[in-house]
Amino acid sequence: MNANLSPQELSEAISAASDTLSRRQNADGHWVFELEADATIPAEYVFLEHYMDRVSPERQRKIGEYLLRIQGDHGGWPMFTDGEFNLSASVKAYAALKAIGHDPAAPYMERARQAILDHGGAERANVFTRIQLALMGAIPWRGVPSMPVQIMHLPKWFFFNIWAMSYWARTCVTPLLVIQALRPSGHFPQKIELREIFKTPPEEIRDWIRGPYRSRWGHVFKLIDGALKLAEPVLSVVARDSAIRKAATFVEERLNGEDGLGAIYPAMAYSLMMYDAMSPAQGHPNMAVIWEAIDLLIVEKEGEVYCQPCVSPVWDTCLSGHAMIEAASNGDPGVSAKVDAACDWLLARQITDVRGDWAEIRPDAVPGGWAFQYRNDHYPDVDDTAVVGMLLHRNGNPKYTTAIERARRWIIGMQSRNGGWGAFDADNDREYLNNIPFADHGALLDPPTADVTARCISFLSQLGHADDRHVIERGIAYLRGDQKPDGSWFGRWGTNYIYGTWSVLCALNAAGLDHTDPTIARAADWLLSIQRADGGWGEDERSYDQNGYVENKESLPSQTAWAMLALMAVGHAGHPAVERAARYLKENQKEGEWEERSFNAVGFPRVFYLKYHGYRLFFPLFALSRLQNLRRSNSKEVASGF
């Protein structure tokens, strides 16, 4: 069989995928797909219902079914599909199943318990797991690193303060500071006994914080933690109440209605427990709307329930819009109308009247970004903003001009000192803070990364303002310095080196670099070298642990599409590898869509991974449509930034 798809085959695949994606669009123009993580968020939701004595037995039963389905052959729970045993996820899942009412003597519980003990016991779980255990009364509070609420009073110039953290850390830590200060016991109708998963009785453990440490800073911060614990009697008095009020005000100002604090589950749950701790008898009026926000994260299907970490409507809509605008040339007259509806929906969600947390570091920047979720006005991100801006610009309707310009100005204002961009904040790069005991996940910060930087360069280059060239050049210099020896780039928000390399090659092409530039050539050669025998590409989440590319055991439609888009961006539209990839996508398409078992993104490398359920739908459509358009073009060059 000819490896190249015929024009008819390609058109049929595009039509089927476009029809499928069109049917998933909501009446108001937006798309939103499931965003799935591992066992930890559903387990934490179980704890929350028990903590608040608001248990839904049927929902909990279905969460139990979900947890059992994703239990690994090793007896525990992984962080991603077919992943290795993860201690913290396994402790949470086991505890959740026990809270739901599963018999500890059941074979699957025995396997989980033994696996936990074989990996050091629950006492070796990470900090956020131990926080949950402390809230449940399963361990003493000394098992959690000390974080005095007086941190709220520390100024921005101090070596540690809440503004030095990433947005996700800030929105979680602030209510947690109040919880730690008040140390509530919750409303558990009955204590959940978990001593059987500890190798040492919790009350006898003294070395809750121990190495290996990432650097010498780890030893320093452990000593500081010990000193803070000794000082707790004093800290319980000095400036405590005013710090609690300041933390509560911070949360109140960012409560965000039915979208929740930070629009992420952990921050919502901690804010709920914070208010409960502050008003344990009568409750707090804000608690009702927080419960509403959490309920909107619940997914129920096929007898199972899980809780999403957040929702992704802006991201899903702008990416679907790019796929559809690329597919419009296939001849379906309804596609353009769907893109227009998506653009109008996005336009209404630009954040122009709120100076979010980003303004603490960039006070002169003008608001103009988009958030990832439905509403998260204090926390727009430059990644979503750049991708939305490119879609509105490609649409070409003059009514979007002002919004695009505001996005441009905000993104320029958010560039970091080193020329790159972080997602939510500028210069959020005090790396020593990742060594504090509270940050054993190593994800306290939001430093510049290649994928986000690339998106900003793509956007600014697509707009083509001559005055922005110096901004773009600084970004390019950052990307050149961040390239790995094999030619790839790290992917902070998608898996992993394929995602990062796709992002950067699109940007370098948009910025006008010659495709023979060694930076581009090395990256393209790397992508070509890792194509799989079936024509697809597939990278495993283990690449984050290995600090280098790790092949998945199967090709992923989304990653295949990224590789195709990357190669086409730098002049390889006619390369046999691209044609083989198109053949792979065509042959694996079923009723207009693709299956994708594996996780395809990351929340925190080595700690928390994600599966975007929409990636398998819109990215292959995007890539196949791009190939069709380049086949038909005279220049064979990608003219857009994305």
What are these regions, as identified by a protein language model?
Residues 1-642:
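Preference for long, amphipathic alpha-helical scaffolds in soluble/luminal domains
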